[in-house]
């Protein structure tokens, strides 16, 4: 299928999805959200894809947030329907079973900032700037996702003030896992993706599910959940076979 608002490409076992509205700073229009959700559905069901990279087109923006002009022009009925669709798309992204790496190539404001908190790993460059704007225009978002990234005290600060976070600070507080020059961003994201894709996809996806499902559980329940998963859902090769395969990949005989 040909998309109007996103680009989709494959590099080995990696899907690279690009929000492609650079003239609008990759603002999240309803159409872009629908296309992104549709492609994510395809990628999730494609066993050849093990990792996803999400980025924005152009040198200025990952995503400037929601498409405000589209919202202003929408009827109440259109707004309600589109809000419901976006809600489901957001949850699909947040609960996506494969790892998603964000290549944060510029500003991520409002809904764009919220989007970054739903990704597993965020790699940014010097142009990255993240700002949670909801309190400034009478809304609330990221209360459920941002504390998992930066911790509750810092999440409160960023959500209450709505202040911008520059790239260096973003890395320091955990909003970015890694900070690289913009000229190296794509390669850095691909290198991380290749490292993940080289591992057993069932284990990687199982670990992600455990991490997400265990949120808020007591420590002992989290321990038991991992043990149960190892016995059942994550049951694969025997430990001996797994270690043997690992050594063979390392060239050890």
Question: What does each model-identified segment do?
Answer:
Residues 1-12, 59, 162-168, 187, ...:
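C-terminal alpha-helix plus adjacent terminal tail
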Residues 1-55:
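Conserved CoA-thioester-binding segment of acyl-CoA-metabolizing enzymes
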Residues 3, 56-92, 108, 218:
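Glycine- (often His-adjacent) and acidic-residue-rich active-site loop
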Residues 17, 21, 36, 54, ...:
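Terminal peptide-recognition signature
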Residues 32-35, 82-85, 185, 226:
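Hydrophobic alpha-helical membrane-association signature
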Residues 39, 85-97, 103:
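Catalytic-core regions built around general acid/base machinery
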Residues 68, 86, 143, 152-155, ...:
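A general structural signal for well-ordered alpha-helical segments in protein cores
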Residues 94-201:
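Crotonase-fold acyl-CoA enzyme core
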């Amino acid at each position: 299928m040909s998309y109007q608002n996103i680009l989709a490409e494959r590099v080995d076992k990696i899907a690279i999805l690009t929000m492609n509205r650079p003239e609008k700073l990759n603002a999240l229009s309803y159409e872009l959200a629908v296309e992104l959700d549709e492609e994510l559905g395809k990628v999730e069901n494609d066993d050849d894809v093990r990792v996803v990279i999400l980025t924005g087109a152009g040198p200025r923006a990952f995503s400037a947030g929601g498409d405000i002009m589209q919202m202003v022009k929408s009827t109440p009925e259109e707004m309600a329907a589109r809000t419901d669709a976006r809600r489901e798309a957001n949850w699909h992204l947040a609960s996506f079973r494969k790892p998603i790496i964000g290549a944060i190539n510029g500003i991520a404001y409002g809904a764009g900032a919220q989007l970054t908190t739903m990704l597993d790993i965020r790699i940014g460059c010097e142009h990255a700037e993240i700002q949670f704007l909801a309190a400034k225009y009478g809304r609330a978002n990221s209360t459920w996702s941002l504390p998992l990234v930066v911790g509750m005290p810092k999440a409160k600060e960023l959500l209450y003030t709505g202040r911008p976070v520059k790239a260096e600070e973003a890395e320091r507080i955990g909003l970015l896992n890694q900070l690289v020059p913009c000229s190296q961003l794509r390669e850095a994201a691909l290198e991380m993706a290749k490292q993940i894709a080289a591992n057993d996809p069932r284990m990687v996806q199982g670990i992600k599910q455990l991490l997400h499902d265990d949120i808020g559980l007591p420590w002992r329940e989290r321990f038991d959940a991992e043990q149960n998963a190892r016995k059942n859902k994550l049951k694969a090769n025997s430990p001996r076979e797994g270690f043997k395969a690992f050594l063979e990949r390392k060239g050890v005989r």
